[in-house]
Each structure stands twice: as structure tokens, then as C-alpha cells.
Amino acid sequence: MNVRLLTLLFLLPQPALAGPPQVLPGQALFQKNCVRCHGANGKKGANGAHDLTKSNLNAFGRTYLVTNGMGKMPAFGKMLTPEQVQQVVAYSLTLK
């Protein structure tokens, strides 16, 4: 009976081995360009930066702000490609 139990346990699905943490495409860009004011979790609020976890802006609104800036937020449209802007915006929407 012990052999059957061991065989059954061996055949059960095994959890995946932990690998290196997955980095989302916009995460590195966010770390480089946004963390100073928004913080790593989007909640820092330095220099008047909004808490990204409580923002009502959708992807379109965030794309506009990242590209053109507003108030104290600088425009990143000349520093980032449109694809990079989309990656940063997509990453910012994952912050909770």
C-alpha cells in the first residue's frame, strides 16, 4: 500500500521551480524614469506626484501625461519611444 501511495504522490502535478523574478517590459523604464517621484510601488507622491494606485486615469490618459507632461510632471515624449511610453503605461496600470 505504501508503494501505491508513493506512486500516486509522484504522479501528482508538481509546482514549478522558482526562477528569477519576471520583469515586465515597462518595469525597467518605470524604475529609471518614474520611481524618483512615484516610488517603486506608485504610492510615493514626492514633489506632488499622484499616487498611481489611486489614479482614475485610463491607459489613454496616462499615455497623454507620460508623453506631454503636466504641472510638475515632465514630458517623456522626446526621451521615450511611443512603444516605451506604452510599456510604462501598461506597467503603471499593474501597480496596486
Task: Indicate where each model-derived feature is located.
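N-terminal signal peptide c-region/cleavage motif recognized by signal peptidases
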Residues: 13-15
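Glycine-centered loop/turn positions within well-structured domains
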Residues: 32-35, 71
